[in-house]
């Protein structure tokens, strides 16, 4: 049963049975499917141990992020590893990365960014002191404007391309094939 699995988990990771059960309960309330519940609970509990987020905060934030991006439940482990790695390598915290990432999720997905790319962009932005609310809004507007310009062509596309040091055709192709590198060229 689930309670046996939770007890077993408490011997593998530094969390009490009660803490793990609370995360499992939250996961159920967040709509995590039963077959993914134990893995999700383990990953979120480990994030609660390895980051500045509690396991509950990690569960709520990442479930919301996954819901916005349509991420498959079997990618939680990989995304958790990405967040810990970014937190270790940027001058920002995991909770700031996730807050910014959630703000960027919808526009990032629309632009064709992967979930790890969205979190990497979030880490880069929050590490230079950009706040999630204002920065997320500004970057969302930028991503949407680029997406619209690439779809329509014309002067707006030419301006984005000029700033990125490319022709309109090059920028349009880069955006469609690797939005993150096109964005990096534009920002850089």
Describe these PLM feature segments.
Residues 139:
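Conserved catalytic-loop aspartate of Hanks-type protein kinases
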Residues 1-81, 87-98, 107-116, 128-136, ...:
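A short, structural motif
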Residues 1, 183-188:
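Short, intrinsically disordered, charge-balanced linker/junction segments flanking boundaries
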């Amino acid at each position: 049963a689930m309670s046996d699995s939770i007890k077993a988990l408490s011997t593998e990771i530094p969390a009490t049975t009660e803490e793990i059960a609370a995360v499992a309960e939250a996961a159920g309330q967040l709509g995590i499917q039963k077959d993914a519940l134990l893995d999700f609970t383990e990953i979120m509990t480990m994030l609660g141990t390895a980051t500045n987020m509690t396991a509950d905060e990690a569960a709520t934030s990442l479930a919301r992020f996954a819901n916005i991006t349509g991420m498959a439940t079997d990618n939680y482990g990989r995304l958790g590893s990405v967040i810990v790695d970014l937190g270790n390598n940027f001058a920002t915290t995991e909770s700031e990365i996730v807050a910014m990432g959630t703000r960027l999720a919808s526009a990032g997905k629309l632009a064709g960014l992967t979930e790890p790319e969205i979190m990497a962009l979030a880490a880069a932005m929050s590490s230079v002191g950009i706040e999630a609310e204002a920065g997320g809004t500004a970057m969302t507007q930028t991503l949407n404007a680029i997406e619209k310009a690439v779809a329509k062509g014309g002067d707006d596309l030419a301006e984005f391309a000029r700033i990125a040091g490319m022709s309109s055709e090059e920028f349009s192709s880069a955006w469609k094939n690797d939005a993150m590198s096109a964005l990096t060229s534009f920002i850089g």
